[in-house]
Each structure stands twice: as structure tokens, then as C-alpha cells.
């Protein structure tokens, strides 16, 4: 299996604690616009079917689902899927799958589009994960991906600062939410 159990459990806990329900709607819509502004909506066929790989809380799916016929929301974390189901309960065109990127039950070559934002770099073999996603797409179908960059070419001090901020982020994520 091409996933890290600790990462899956950690993000499941984070999505459960911070389910995006208190985030300002205008802020979420602006974030969606920044990520999806280059997505080629106009090339999608009528009644498109696609996937959100690593859907988390469903924050992107809530904006994509109204534009498509069917959206497959995939996540390896049951906790994340529970949050996504709750957040997307009014979207009757979302189908939820608990699966890792390499065992997704979508047929190869069947999807009109796909996206995975901020997810695949957390998978042990990122290249294999990307290949698994692309394999699900019809020929020429668009796939929007956002990967965090590698620290390989960064100086040691930069990596140390990042580690401190990451530890701080993890600690804050575990604080109780009022």
C-alpha cells in the first residue's frame, strides 16, 4: 500500500478537529478561485464525472460538485470521509470511497477530470501516486495537482525553520476548538 498510516491518521484527526465549518464562506471561495483558476472547466464534456483524490473535509468538493454530474471523493482516512460526508450532505452527486491512491475503486480510463491538492507529496511514492491518479483519467482529461516543494535544494537553516513551524502547526491543531 502506497500510504503512510501515521499521516493518514494525523490528517483524519485534524479534519475532525478543524472541519472547515467555521471558515468564512467568502474566504473559502477565494481560496478555491486561487487553486482552480487555471482548471480548464470549458473542456469538460457534458455531465462530467471526476474525482477528488485525498478529499479531506471536502472543502474543494463543495465548489466542484455543483459544476459536475458526479464527483468521487476519495480519502484513506475514515475520519476525513465522515467529515466530508457531513460537510457535503446537501450534495447528492458526491460518492465517497475510503481508499488509498493505489487501491481506488474507480476503473482506469473512466474519469473526465480529477484533482488532488496538497495530498500526493504525503504519499511515500509520490510519482507512483501521481501515475495511479492519471491512470484513472480518460485520454486528454485534465488533472489538477498541487504538490509542496522539496527541501533538497534549501539550506539547513531553512529546513530547521520549517520543522519548527510544522511542529507548531501540529501542536495548534491538537488544541481544543471552542
Where are these regions (language model features)?
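Conserved class I S-adenosyl-L-methionine
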Residues: 142-174
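A short SAM/SAH-binding and catalytic strip from SAM-dependent methyltransferases
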Residues: 113-124
Amino acid at each position: 500500500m502506497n500510504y503512510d498510516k501515521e499521516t493518514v491518521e494525523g490528517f483524519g484527526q485534524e479534519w475532525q478537529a478543524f472541519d472547515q465549518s467555521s471558515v468564512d464562506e467568502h474566504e473559502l471561495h477565494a481560496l478555491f478561485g486561487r487553486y482552480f483558476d487555471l482548471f480548464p472547466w470549458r473542456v469538460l464534456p457534458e455531465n462530467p464525472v471526476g474525482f477528488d483524490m485525498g478529499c479531506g473535509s471536502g472543502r474543494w468538493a463543495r465548489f466542484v460538485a455543483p459544476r459536475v454530474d458526479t464527483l468521487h471523493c476519495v480519502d484513506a482516512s475514515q475520519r476525513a470521509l465522515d467529515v466530508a460526508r457531513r460537510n457535503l450532505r446537501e450534495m447528492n452527486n458526491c460518492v465517497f470511497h475510503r481508499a488509498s491512491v493505489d487501491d481506488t475503486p474507480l476503473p482506469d480510463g473512466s474519469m473526465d477530470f480529477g484533482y488532488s491538492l496538497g495530498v500526493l507529496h504525503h504519499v511515500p511514492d509520490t510519482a507512483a501516486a501521481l501515475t495511479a491518479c492519471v491512470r484513472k483519467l480518460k485520454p486528454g482529461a485534465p488533472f489538477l495537482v498541487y504538490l509542496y516543494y522539496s527541501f533538497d535544494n534549501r539550506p539547513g537553516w531553512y529546513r530547521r525553520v520549517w520543522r519548527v513551524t510544522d511542529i507548531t502547526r501540529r501542536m495548534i491543531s491538537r488544541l481544543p476548538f471552542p
